[in-house]
């Protein structure tokens, strides 16, 4: 893969569906993941292993992971909150475990029901648990750019957490703009500082389009050296424990941006759009994505018949 390739990690099966009030059948989740696996994605966040009381929409994570047809070259990621979740994910043969902790103490207490210090201690237990297993670890720094309870987050706080995760032996880092509070200048600055600590291959950016800056933030991060980005088909998703955390950046809109700007990527947009157009029937409402509605710039329309008659 070329060094300038933008890698899209598809998160709709997990982050996209976790706040949906309508139950999506297990077979439909599996079918969605299997379809995504054929469209050029190399990474898919396929589900989570959290308490069904906390996230009832994803209570079938075990069945989903056991039911998918694993495509060669695709890494299937599971979000886990604790060691119990890690044990379930290992049993279900997840390829990568994604741990989550907030840069904000208040949000971490709301989301994880514990302090940041206790979360970090628990991560050490998980690192020990997976030793010897053929699984990689990633840690998401939630509210890395801003918190709906505390406001702007000190960049040094984020860098401290990145250092702490790396010292534990966690290989991957995600910076998450959990409630869409980031702006491009802020993104450029923080990404550059984090890339002084970790290689681009270990860094993922997770943006929300809550305030309309999602794709602008992607472009800022890409130009600062980041290469991997979370995105959700149709723009589905949000955090149930963060006020105002509307949808993730839309996968097809991001791929369209890449194609229009000739940024290398691996996703087949022409085949992705029909899949996105099935989402309203799946979740029972319209979805935020734009390109699935408008079509690509190359999808031209016939001119009105009268045009040919005008001199």
What are these regions (language model features)?
Residues 1-311:
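Catalytic cores and adjacent flexible loops of soluble metabolic enzymes
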